[in-house]
Amino acid sequence: MAKSADIRPGITLACTECKERNYITTKNRRNTPDRLELKKFCPRCGKQTVHRETR
């Protein structure tokens, strides 16, 4: 049987403006095979920016 880490891998989210990696989360590969893009607060920029999944 597949482990939960295979289906829900850990990913990091990086700010698109300053490229700092601010957030760590998991995602379900079956539901979202493409890269995540979430609007989150970046402490370095001091505002909400788009954070993209990095590998």
From Swiss-Prot:
PROSITE patterns: RIBOSOMAL_L33. Gene3D superfamilies: Ribosomal protein L33. GO terms for biological process: translation. Keywords: Ribonucleoprotein, Ribosomal protein. It holds the Pfam family Ribosomal_L33. GO terms for cellular component: cytoplasm; ribonucleoprotein complex; ribosome. HAMAP family: Ribosomal_bL33. This is Large ribosomal subunit protein bL33. It comes from Bifidobacterium longum (strain DJO10A).
